[in-house]
Curated annotation (Swiss-Prot):
An MF annotation (GO) of this entry: pantetheine-phosphate adenylyltransferase activity
The protein's name: Phosphopantetheine adenylyltransferase
Listed pathway(s): Cofactor biosynthesis; coenzyme A biosynthesis; CoA from (R)-pantothenate: step 4/5
EC number(s) from the headed UniProt entry: 2.7.7.3
Assembly behavior: Homohexamer.
Catalysed reaction, written as an equation: (R)-4'-phosphopantetheine + ATP + H(+) = 3'-dephospho-CoA + diphosphate
Keywords, alphabetical: ATP-binding, Coenzyme A biosynthesis, Cytoplasm, Magnesium, Nucleotide-binding, Nucleotidyltransferase, Transferase
Organism domain of life: Bacteria
UniProt-annotated location(s): Cytoplasm
Length: 163
């Protein structure tokens, strides 16, 4: 059986922490599907199409990684429809673990054939979130160390558009 993993998220924007998880997942699984979830109730910086394109560019050297846009639904339902038998979740700290553990237990109840795999965030990304980076950038801080170059440039352009 092929090992297919879904890594779902809003990725607004995708960070080097996300990219690190994707690189590590690509070594563990036959295929990694990055699911850019479309949440119409959430205000995002990038459109789903922009996020998909930016992530594809950042992961283009990984042949077993593909990026899709996915309407918001139960993650396990997305995994089933894509043929994924694993879900990837990144854990930065104890708070993330407690939150993700409960979701993983519910997902296991809903779809016992799908296994959740937790990957611990590596330094220097363990403290980084997309929200934090957007906030730092908004006030003029340098976030270039935490973003893939193409995403950093796109984010800077968005910031210029805000001004």
């Amino acid at each position: 059986m092929r090992k297919i993993a879904l890594f779902p998220g809003s990725f607004d924007p995708m960070t080097n922490g996300h990219l690190n998880l994707i690189e590590r997942s690509a070594k563990l699984f036959d295929e990694v599907i990055i699911g850019v979830f479309i949440n119409t109730s959430k205000q995002t910086l990038f459109t789903p199409e922009e996020k998909k394109y930016l992530i594809e560019e950042a992961t283009k050297e990984m042949p077993n990684v593909r990026v899709i846009m996915q309407e918001t639904q139960l993650t396990v339902e997305s995994a089933k429809s894509l043929g994924a038998n694993f879900l990837i979740r990144g854990i930065r700290n104890v708070k993330d673990y407690e939150y993700e553990k409960d979701i993983a237990k519910m997902n296991q109840h809903l779809a016992p054939e799908i296994e959740t795999v937790f990957l611990l965030a590596e330094e220097p990304y363990a403290h980084v979130s997309s929200s934090l980076l957007k906030e730092v950038l908004r006030f003029g801080g340098d976030v270039s160390d935490y973003l893939p170059p193409n995403i950093y440039h796109a984010l800077k352009q968005k910031k210029n558009d805000w001004s």
